[in-house]
């Protein structure tokens, strides 16, 4: 039997679910009467989405469709960081949507401090873009998971728990 148990807190999303969501959004935009002739393009790059469309109003509608479809596919809306729209050539509007992945040092430190202040029986270590929480009993780790889930709204990133051992 192991003398210590641990798990990792990470911020990640399923890229394939995002691709499927964007396919649904493109299909929905192509079928909707008010968006059909807007010539909307949604491009997925490595760390961001680029939405190019005809006007601010259609951009808002496309954002709404994106949020709805992402929610239906169990993607957290916290992965989307909507930047300010900018004008593109030919009376078009472009918006960059950055995709949040991984815990920044600032968020990892905040999470680490939060767990250390509340639970004295666990140790917290920041490991790159994840936070490892270690404890002698599984009950302590369950308490840490409940604490982090309860405080997740204070953080700007979605959290997942991996490598529970």
UniProtKB/Swiss-Prot annotation:
SUPFAM superfamilies: YajQ-like. Belongs to the YajQ family. GO terms for molecular function: nucleotide binding. It comes from the Bacteria. Gene3D superfamilies: 3.30.70.860, YajQ-like, domain 2 (3.30.70.990). Pfam families: DUF520. This is Nucleotide-binding protein Syncc9605_0652. One of its GO terms (cellular component) is cytosol. Keywords: Nucleotide-binding. The keyword Nucleotide-binding applies. The keyword Nucleotide-binding applies. InterPro entries: DUF520 (IPR007551), UPF0234-like_C (IPR035571), UPF0234_N (IPR035570), YajQ-like_sf (IPR036183). It comes from Synechococcus sp. (strain CC9605). Nucleotide-binding protein.
């Amino acid at each position: 039997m192991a003398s210590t148990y641990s798990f990792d807190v990470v911020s990640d999303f399923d890229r394939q679910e995002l691709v499927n969501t964007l396919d649904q959004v493109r299909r929905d935009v192509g079928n909707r009467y008010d968006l059909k002739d807007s010539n909307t393009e949604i491009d997925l790059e490595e760390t961001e989405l680029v939405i190019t469309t005809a006007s601010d109003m259609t951009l808002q509608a496309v954002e709404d469709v994106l949020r709805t479809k992402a929610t239906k596919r169990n993607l957290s809306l916290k992965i989307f960081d909507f930047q300010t729209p900018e004008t593109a050539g030919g009376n078009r509007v472009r918006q960059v949507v950055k995709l949040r992945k991984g815990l920044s040092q600032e968020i990892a430190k905040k999470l680490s401090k939060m767990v250390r202040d509340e639970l004295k029986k666990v140790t917290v270590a920041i490991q790159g873009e994840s936070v490892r929480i270690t404890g002698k009993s599984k009950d302590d780790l369950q308490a840490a998971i409940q604490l982090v889930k309860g405080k997740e709204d204070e953080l700007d990133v979605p959290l997942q728990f991996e490598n529970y051992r």
